């Protein structure tokens, strides 16, 4: 007689995509996008992810993703133009290297229009996706340059050149962290950020 194991493995995979649009009404329609700036996988803070899952199962406070954070410490451009990437922060009391801006993405807690989360599942499969969306409109963040073709922008020091993003709970646990080639946010650009977390069960 074969005894069925009560154990299974949980794996979380993440993927980030940043798409630029010119008009807010086009957001979500990739056929009208200006360009895709980032399309890559992310790193997961395994300890904090385990805390998040346990809280969600027990229906406890801070058991969901609450904010998407943007930073400027994920990459450095050297004098020769080479991009040096920082190692994603996935252990201990981790945070973004240089956090500068965030968006609330929990649409059950007054997230701005366009920011939302959704769960997607295909019957019969052993994975489910959490799709987390944030839209940074033309007037966000305050103080950015009017156009992205303005000269003199320092890719290493500007507060509006993002090169790292992380997802956090409301009590500030960093669950994911991804670094990427610097992307400048200016007032002529609308960014849609789609962050997908795939929760996979392996028996």
PLM regions: where:
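Small cysteine-rich, disulfide-bonded extracellular modules of the LU/uPAR three-finger superfamily
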Residues: 1-162, 171-203
């Amino acid at each position: 007689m074969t005894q069925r194991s009560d154990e299974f493995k949980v794996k979380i995979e993440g993927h980030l995509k940043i798409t630029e649009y010119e008009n807010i009404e086009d957001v979500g329609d990739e056929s009208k996008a200006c360009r895709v700036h980032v399309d890559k996988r992310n790193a997961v803070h395994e300890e904090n992810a385990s805390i998040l899952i346990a809280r969600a199962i027990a229906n406890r406070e801070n058991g969901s993703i609450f904010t998407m954070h943007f930073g400027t410490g994920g990459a450095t451009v050297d004098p020769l133009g080479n991009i040096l990437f920082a190692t994603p922060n996935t252990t201990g009391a981790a945070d973004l290297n240089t956090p500068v801006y965030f968006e609330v993405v929990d649409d059950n807690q007054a997230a701005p229009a366009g920011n939302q989360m959704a769960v997607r599942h295909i019957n019969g499969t052993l994975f489910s996706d959490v799709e987390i969306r944030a839209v940074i409109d033309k007037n966000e963040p305050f103080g950015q340059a009017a156009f992205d073709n303005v000269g003199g922008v320092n890719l290493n020091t500007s507060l509006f050149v993002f090169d790292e993003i992380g997802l956090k709970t409301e009590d500030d646990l960093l669950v994911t962290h991804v670094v990427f080639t610097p992307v400048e946010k200016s007032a002529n650009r609308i960014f849609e950020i789609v962050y997908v977390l795939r929760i996979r069960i392996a028996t």
